[in-house]
Structures are given as C-alpha cells and as structure tokens.
C-alpha cells in the first residue's frame, strides 16, 4: 500500500471537491430550510465545508422516499443475487475511491491518514462485501409438524432503519450497519455525526453509482437534537441502529417508548479492563498490544483498553516496557504518513479530556503526561498509576488516550475489579494458564474477551456489549438478527 507523503496529501486536499448536501431519494439536495453548519478541520481549526443542516422536515422527506421504495419492493423484494451484485459493486467503488474517502475521513476527524487508508476504508468496504456475499446463504427453516401441515420460518426485512453513527470511525461504523441492513432488503436513513459527515455524504453518491435504487439509502446531516431526535421520535421508523454514548442511547430508548415502540439497537460506551497476570507469555508483546489498545485512534475507541490491571509482582517491569512502547504513539500531523497519533475530534473534546487529566492528578500518580502535544486538539499518551478504582478517572468513559493502572494480587481480585463497571464492552486476559484463561473469559461480563491479544477479530464474529454498553450485535451473521423480522407461516395441507 502506498501511503505517499505529507505534501502529496496536502496538495490532494487543496483540490478535493467536498459534497455538502443531503442525499434524499437518489439526489443531492439542500436542506428544506436552506440552513447549514460548519465542519471544522481539527488540526487548523479552519472550516472545511458548510454542511446542509437537516431537520424534521428533511427527515420526513427521507422517510417518504425510504418507505415508498420499501413498499414498492424495488429493493426489499429483489433477489439476494441482485442485492449481492449491487453491494459488491459498491465495495468495488469504495476501494477505487479509497484515497478520496481516506482523505475525507482524516480531514474531518484528525485521525492519521495511514490509519484511514490502511484500516478504516478497507474495513468499511470489507463489511459491505461480507454481507453482499453472505445474504444468499441465509436460509429459512422448516419446523417439524404432522404430515398434513407445513410450518415455515422465514426472515423478512424490518422496513425503514434509522442508522445513527458517531464520529470516531465514521465510514467503518456506517458500513457495519449498512452492510447487513441493505443486504437484508431494508431502506435506511443515515444520520452521521455533525462532527464527521463528509464520508457518509460521499458514500451515498457511490451507492447510487453502484445501482442502489433511489430512496433505499438516504443521508440526512444535522444535529442530534434536530435530525437525530426527529428520527428517534418518528412514528414510521421501524428500528434504530445506533453507536455512540450511553447517555444518548438512553434517550433513544425513551424516545422509542414515547413514540411507536420502534426497535433500538445500541452499541454504547465502554471502560474495558486489560488484565495482565504474572504468567503472561510475553510481557513485551503485551505492552505493545496494551499501548495500541489505548492509544490507537487517539484513544477514541469504544472498546479501548482504558483500565490496565497488573499483577503486583510484574507491575513495575510492565510499566517500564509500556513507557517505552508509548514512544511509538506520539501526536503529529494527520496527513503525514509517518504519524501514528493525530488529533482528537475537536478542541471541545480535547478540553473534556484535559479536565479528566487535571482531576486525575489528585487521584493517582501521573506516570506519563500527554499534554502540550503541539497541536491544539492533540493529546499524547497519558498514564496514571495506583488510581482509586472508585475515582471517576477509573469509572467514566474519557474517550481519549488516558490509561488508568491498578495493581492486583489475586485472580479473584482482578475479576472483581474488571467487572466493577457500568460498562461491559470488552476485556482482555494475558496468561499462560489455559484453565485460568477459560475461567476468566466465562466470568468476565463483557461482549468480547481477548486472550493474549487486545481487540483482535474480523467480520466473522459479533461485536457488542453487556450492561450499559448496549444490546444487539454488529458484524457477523448475528447482525442480521437486528435487521430482519422472523415470521412463522403455518399451512394446512388438507384444506
């Protein structure tokens, strides 16, 4: 893969055409009230584009298009083979436009171009292609009945899905939802975060080029309290697929209950525990994976290993190795292919992370201070040790490159510390002891448990959380459960 060089990407950014309109019923269009908002480059703080500010009237327009095409059956009743062909074409186009999409992602979010080009865009295309290839292999069932009856169990598309996605992995998380939703035959109204809407807008144009019927995918940009709320309270939306904060997830559940009891599938916050036992097979490897698990994407990862639990006897040795590994994660210009850490999404979020660091200085020892990183919205690797497990630093999702270290002396204590959280998205265990690995994996209250790695995985396995980290699953065939209805058809053969 050719990552080019800083000047290449800067020149490309200058000539980049940025689409800024809504996408409704197969066409780019201004918001009904002709209002816009600015999306800002987190490096320079300069405006990138004026984006259409969609509101409830625009959601209604998108709803009309989405419902109309769904009821006509242009997509919902089409064959799996047709859907497969269109979605594979979309994946092809995403790969062909990988540099453009990666640049939009990096300009919008401040993440390193290396990661956008190597991880985000290929991962997004892979998600679309995976469900394209899977959908004609999903079968119904025939239940056992008497000889004069036939009972069939079939899966049908839910209807119109509202997909609400966050700003940390805009295109990747969009495609985790679009892949199964579209493959199953649904129509989708996509609302990207107002902080990172550019790649979603561009994706809509590529979907039309791939042959997706008009109205099947609509993109309405805007704010959560306007466009987002219009979706969550809309009486004609059949389901919401959401990734974001636990606080917003709770509001979506309330809105669904107050409207039409639409399904709400949530992937929310996390405060994942990374547990290193004294019999860890390779402390150097564990330190490297731990650093990547908290500092990748500037710590703006829902499943980041933000709590490091170290067995007392190896804690000091491990922390020395971890400090060395942190040197590989230093903020730089996001368009420089050598950069491993970019900026946080914006200065407001950086201020929030700074406030946690200031508070943490009175709660534990600051082993590594990532402040003064050189860019306004950037924060480097930050590590606190010996923090009270009850402190907010240990319990709240910071969503930045801030690691909290706690020591333990027994397996039971490690388990108690790990599970003592409102969240349950991920956890990791480093040990040579296979029996311990099994015990811990089964007793940890988390949707994903990693043994001797951190956050490995691919499209074949589900992703989601326990407790206030959400419900339902993204990725794998299990994601189709969110986007399909299960119908029983009972036929009397003697009639």
Curated annotation (Swiss-Prot):
GO terms for molecular function: aldehyde dehydrogenase (NAD+) activity; aldehyde dehydrogenase (NADP+) activity; aldehyde dehydrogenase [NAD(P)+] activity. Lithium ions exhibits the highest inhibition (97%). To a lesser extent (5-20%), potassium, sodium, and ammonium ions also inhibit PuuC activity. Transition metals, such as copper and zinc ions inhibit PuuC activity by more than 90%. The presence of heavy metals (mercury, silver) or sodium hydrogensulfite in the reaction mixture completely inactivate PuuC; in contrast, disulfide reductants such as DTT and 2-mercaptoethanol significantly increase its activity by 75% and 27%, respectively. NAD(+) binds at residues 244-249. Transmembrane segments: none annotated. The active site is at residues 267, 302. It catalyses: an aldehyde + NADP(+) + H2O = a carboxylate + NADPH + 2 H(+); an aldehyde + NAD(+) + H2O = a carboxylate + NADH + 2 H(+); 4-(gamma-L-glutamylamino)butanal + NADP(+) + H2O = 4-(gamma-L-glutamylamino)butanoate + NADPH + 2 H(+); 4-(gamma-L-glutamylamino)butanal + NAD(+) + H2O = 4-(gamma-L-glutamylamino)butanoate + NADH + 2 H(+). Its EC number is 1.2.1.5. It holds the Pfam family Aldedh. Pathway: Amine and polyamine degradation; putrescine degradation; 4-aminobutanoate from putrescine: step 3/4. It comes from the Bacteria. PROSITE patterns: ALDEHYDE_DEHYDR_CYS (PS00070), ALDEHYDE_DEHYDR_GLU (PS00687). Optimum temperature is 37 degrees Celsius. It appears to be stable between 20 and 50 degrees Celsius but becomes very unstable at or above 50 degrees Celsius. InterPro entries: Ald_DH/histidinol_DH, Ald_DH_C, Ald_DH_CS_CYS, Ald_DH_CS_GLU, Ald_DH_N, Aldehyde_DH_dom. Belongs to the aldehyde dehydrogenase family. This is NADP/NAD-dependent aldehyde dehydrogenase PuuC. The lineage of its organism: Bacteria, Pseudomonadati, Pseudomonadota, Gammaproteobacteria, Enterobacterales.
